[in-house]
UniProtKB/Swiss-Prot annotation:
Biological source species: Pseudomonas entomophila (strain L48)
Protein origin, superkingdom: Bacteria
Lineage of the species this protein comes from: Bacteria, Pseudomonadati, Pseudomonadota, Gammaproteobacteria, Pseudomonadales
Designated name of the protein: UPF0312 protein PSEEN5043
Main location: periplasm
Gene Ontology CC annotations of this record: periplasmic space
Length: 192
């Protein structure tokens, strides 16, 4: 009886360990320009200002058999914002908006991933920005995974969300500019 119990326990442990081993760790490839954190905000209700954050880092775990077990963490330097207009960038970075001297970083850490289709999911997590942490849900799309030409393995995703700036204590420049659209595109390199 003891042998059967031990064998069952060993098999169970092996199966659990195998399941945990399937999730792989990926480092977001920002060095090769294969990852972007882009934003868009209304300009007076007439057009949109587009920009990006140039300095960020992050990682994620991914198992295509268990997408719900995935996790992601992204840190970005708020002073790295760029909108192709130096004076506007200075103004956005100032105390009037992001106050990057007081709040130099923003961070997103996922708390849950819920599949919504074959290649789509809702990724919910805590976004800390401007000294405020709020739950945010991104609509994510799995783009694909596989080997790269350099002998590594990669996986790629896009994710979008809309933020209400007032929720983070940031006053937009007017009633038409209280929401910010975020569009994140990442390609991760599997870590060995």
């Amino acid at each position: 009886m003891l042998k059967k119990t031990f064998a069952a326990l060993a098999l169970g442990t092996a199966l659990i360990s195998a399941g945990q081993a399937m999730a792989a760790e990926y480092k977001i490839d920002k060095e090769g320009q294969h990852a972007f954190v882009d934003w868009k905000i209304s300009h007076l209700g007439y057009s949109f200002i587009h920009g990006t954050f140039k300095d960020f880092d992050g990682n994620f775990t991914w198992d295509s058999a268990k997408p719900e077990a995935s996790k992601i963490s992204v840190d970005l330097k708020t002073a790295s914002l760029w909108s192709n207009h130096a004076e506007r960038d200075k103004h956005i970075a100032s105390k009037d908006f992001l106050d990057v001297k007081k709040y130099p970083e923003a961070k997103f850490v996922s708390t849950s991933v819920k599949s919504t289709g074959d290649k789509t999911a809702d990724v919910t997590g805590d976004l800390t920005m401007h000294g405020v942490t709020k739950p945010v849900t991104f609509k994510a799309v799995f783009n694909g995974e596989g080997k790269d030409p350099w002998g590594g393995e990669r996986a790629g995703f896009n994710a979008t969300t809309t933020l209400n700036l007032n929720d983070f204590g940031i006053k937009g420049p007017g009633a038409t500019s209280q929401t910010l659209d975020l569009d994140i595109s990442v390609e991760g390199v599997k870590q060995k």
